[in-house]
Amino acid sequence: MIIGITGGIGSGKTTLSNLLRSNGYPVYDTDKEARRLQNEDDKLIAETKALFGENIYVNGELDRKTVASIVFSQPELLTQLSSIVHPVVKNDIIQWASSFTSNKLIFIESAVLFEGGFDVFTDKIILVTASEEIRIARVIKRDGMTKEQIIARIKNQIPDAVKAQKSDLVINTDQGLPENTLQSIIIWQH
């Protein structure tokens, strides 16, 4: 069974994923793997350079800060970037998931689970939520981003209210991850 984990920036997705990993559950992090693929997949590198120019790679690494500053101020470029990255990530998910037996419980973490079409791989979906104020405070502390940068990212994601309608379980992390979260997920998924 494959369970999707989604939620906006700063909602607590990664905290939940880390809890699952520490308890032996495999978690595919689409953001982390997209970063890896953008530096390793030759076709994706070529398409990214075609979109942003040769100088978008510095010492063989994608300049993610520059890309972020461009795409979050120009939504059409975010759409174009997503259209070249998401298919490569989907293929990578297929390869990753095929390495597990069908009775193994595995997870896919993605802020853009629905936007990227990664939800097609899932049997159930968990939405991790928190108030916008808490999310902003968490991301400022974690990443040092400005409030304006965070709000720009939030505006480019499907609202939690819409995601909740498409999700099977909603976990609110305003007070942190609930103590019995892991046990609740194990019981719920059966």
Role assignments for model-derived ranges:
Residues 11:
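ATP-binding Walker
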Residues 93, 120-121, 132, 141, ...:
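Small-molecule kinase domains that catalyze NTP-dependent phosphoryl transfer to phosphate-bearing small molecules
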Residues 3-5:
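Hydrophobic anchor at the beta1->P-loop junction of P-loop NTPases
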Residues 35-101:
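ATP-dependent small-molecule kinase phosphotransfer cores
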Residues 14:
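Walker A/P-loop
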